[in-house]
């Protein structure tokens, strides 16, 4: 039940326990969680928020930010430009709303969405959890729609059945 908060520039907030939260509101900040049920949030530019536990969320609202999750049922979200949202766990969702951003979801049931101009990177696995395909597409607003979660099916981008984050 820990919390670490920074409001100044060049700050770092870190949690290693469960049910934790790390928050930065200044520029050039980092917020990190390694426990389950954690949240790491940055609102400044050039920030990074990282979770390695299950049921986690990492969020950035500033430009040139990165949000990363490696646990199951996680969500990584960016609203600034030049941002990256990455998931490597199952049932994860990566969202990017900044122009020229990248949303990457490597989980078995991963999905990604973004604004027009963003790139989505997805992976597909077989029933034995072997990687079958990895693919990147640009959100063009026509073939790949804005603000729509996609997943890979048979090596092609397909609209995800569940549109909620982390489902």
Q: PLM ranges: what are they?
A:
Residues 1-97:
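Thr-biased low-complexity repeat/linker tracts and other Thr-enriched repetitive architectures
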Residues 106, 110-167:
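Intrinsically disordered, low-complexity terminal regions
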Residues 81, 90-91, 97-102, 108-119:
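Glycine-anchored, exposed beta-strand/edge motif detector
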